[in-house]
Amino acid sequence: MEAVDQHRRDGAARDDDVRRYEGARPVTEHPILFNEPMSAAARAGRKSQTRRVVRGESLNWLNLANFTPECVAQRENGFSPYGYDGDRLWVRETHIAYGRWETRYSAKKERDEWHFVDMTLETGREYRFDGEVPNAARGGVLPTWWRRPSIFMPRAAARTLLEVTGVRVERLQNISEPDARAEGVTIEGHHMRGYCAGAYRPPSIRAFHDLWDSLNAARGHGWDTDPWVWAVEFRRIGS
């Protein structure tokens, strides 16, 4: 009996060590690109999942017969570019910044290139997401407002911050109906057509199919290729 009690105490001590380790693990932040409709869906609470194509070393491991998707998704392996439970994602989206353009020499391309000088914060302004912007040409001396692509958004401009609540790796076509709805899809009339008559997939998955292909088919990762994807679950926590 004493040995059993000692075993339980040892197990409890190990559990405490794990909790202390997890509690001490620093929270990391990662940028993630969303288009405007998906950003709006996340802010409204209609989007709580996103799927992204698995690339690089992670994909190489998936091609090994003895390495499962569960292994690739484990925190200990550190493959996820989107973090793990408790980490944060800040959404990069199209935005409007205040600044000017100047030319800088690119040694890589061996020529001058236009470079945007972001002056939004230093001039006491805030980044915008709506409204008109002047149709100015690059090279103007005076700064003004410019619509900027999502890839160039700085962390300071982010208005949507998400906390990761789950990460896994799966085939794209394994998505369930609830997961498709959690992707924030918009179900239209043609997605409903034929469903009651036995259409193969539910409307939410058909809507997700269309959304996915609109973003990824031209890149060679369409629905029909059924790529490995990171399935990331999250909740909105602020900006």
Give names to the regions the model predicted.
Residues 2-239:
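Secondary-structure transition motif
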